[in-house]
From Swiss-Prot:
Cell wall formation. Catalyzes the transfer of a GlcNAc subunit on undecaprenyl-pyrophosphoryl-MurNAc-pentapeptide (lipid intermediate I) to form undecaprenyl-pyrophosphoryl-MurNAc-(pentapeptide)GlcNAc (lipid intermediate II). Signal peptide: none annotated. Keywords: Cell cycle, Cell division, Cell inner membrane, Cell membrane, Cell shape, Cell wall biogenesis/degradation, Glycosyltransferase, Membrane, Peptidoglycan synthesis, Transferase. It comes from Dichelobacter nodosus (strain VCS1703A). This is UDP-N-acetylglucosamine--N-acetylmuramyl-(pentapeptide) pyrophosphoryl-undecaprenol N-acetylglucosamine transferase. The gene is murG. It is an enzyme of class 2 (transferase). Belongs to the glycosyltransferase 28 family. MurG subfamily. Its EC number is 2.4.1.227. Pathway: Cell wall biogenesis; peptidoglycan biosynthesis. UDP-N-acetyl-alpha-D-glucosamine binds at T15, G16, G17, N127, R169, S197, I251, A270, L271, T272, V273, S274, E275, Q296. It is found in: Cell inner membrane.
Length: 363
């Protein structure tokens, strides 16, 4: 196989939305014999998840620029210069065959270092709106891959790109079809609530309030993932309102969680939307209102357009509105219809397309 023995350096960090798609590609490449390295920040989300996956992790001193004010931007040239120097030394040591940037601030210095060293650079954009790092790297990358055509808006026309969709973990792609999963299901509607790796305040605090407004017999069976920092406060809110739910900080087995659910309430990060489409589930999305260029709303549009999902704006969302939305989703057969429509937006071939693009760059 072309990837056997090849050294691949992945760059992705900051949030699960960047790290998990990159891990899906890294695992698939490792199965084909590649040696996987990862460039990131030890204190970031990737610093924990990548070593857990068994891959070699290389730390560089870099942080995001957005939200750090004037001082952060003034320090940026020095921080980036140092990070590029660190990334360059790491690449000279490990000599990767291909460098793969999948978003997050660590990708920027790494991409620049790859260009300086003339190492093939591939970038992949998961969101419907291209992020700052990938928009800059698109001018020097050998290969540009996009999850959707919408993301091409920030790429100058002279830079060719391919639309591949988003890579999703294999265990999710292997889930039975919605009809098979729903066939013998009865009892209370099963609701999966996803607060994301960073936690979503609006979802975590409004959801228990909304459920408390419903009669006991209309309340779904809830599995609520809060993110670590919102766990205790969310548990307190449920207890104070005398609403029962299974509340967890993280879900390790997302395939199982999707398989057991009838529908989902979630933010609309690119990875979440892709996983829901691939699994086949009805969804109610509450996009993060401060996402750059409102990309989370755009991420959710495909599922909304095919009738698999609804989108509610956080700024106008109340417990009453959310309670009404939950109350209107009591018909499992209607949820099954939406679940089947969701699969029209799935990216089942994305992983193979990305691996093919990596192989093309291997010398």
């Amino acid at each position: 196989m072309i990837l056997k023995g090849k050294k691949l350096l992945f760059m992705a960090g900051g949030t699960g939305g960047h790290v998990y798609p990159a891990l899906a590609v890294a695992r698939a490449a490792a199965e084909q014999g590649s040696i996987i390295h990862w460039l990131g920040n030890q204190s970031g989300f990737e610093g924990k998840k990548v070593p857990e996956a068994g891959f070699i992790f290389h730390d560089i001193a870099v942080y995001g620029l957005r939200g750090n004010g004037v001082i952060g931007w003034l320090k940026a040239p020095f921080m980036i210069g140092r990070a590029v120097f660190q990334a360059k030394k790491i690449m000279q040591h490990i000599q990767p065959d291909v460098v793969i940037g999948m978003g997050g601030f660590a990708s920027g210095p790494g991409g620049i270092a790859a260009k300086i060293l003339n190492i093939p650079l591939l970038i992949h954009e998961q969101n419907a709106v291209m992020g700052l790092t990938n928009a800059l790297l698109s001018r020097v990358a050998n290969t540009i891959l996009l999850a959707s055509q919408q993301a091409a808006a920030k790429i100058a026309l002279k830079y060719p790109y391919r639309v591949t969709g988003n890579p999703v973990r294999e265990d999710i792609t292997l889930l039975p079809a919605p009809e098979e999963r729903f066939h013998y299901r009865s009892g209370r509607i099963r609701l999966l609530v996803l607060g994301g790796s960073q936690g979503a305040k609006a979802i975590n605090l409004l959801l228990p309030q909304a459920l408390s407004l419903l009669p006991e017999e209309q309340r779904p069976q809830v599995l609520h993932q809060t993110g670590a920092r919102w766990l205790e406060k969310t548990q307190t809110e449920y207890a104070a309102l005398n609403v029962h739910a299974e509340i967890v900080p993280f879900i390790d087995d997302m395939a199982k969680a999707y398989a057991n659910a009838d529908w989902v309430i979630a933010r609309s990060g690119a990875l979440t939307v892709s996983e829901i489409a691939t699994a086949g589930l009805a969804a109610l999305f509450i996009p993060f209102p401060y996402a750059v260029d409102d990309h989370q709303t755009m991420n959710a549009q495909c599922l909304a357009e095919v009738g698999a999902a609804a989108i509610l704006e956080e700024k106008t969302l109340t417990a009453d509105i959310l309670a009404t939305a939950i109350q209107s989703r009591q018909d499992r057969s209607a949820l099954l219809t939406q679940a089947e429509r969701a699969r029209l937006c799935s990216d089942e071939k994305a992983l193979g397309e990305i691996l093919r693009a990596i192989k093309e760059l291997c010398r």
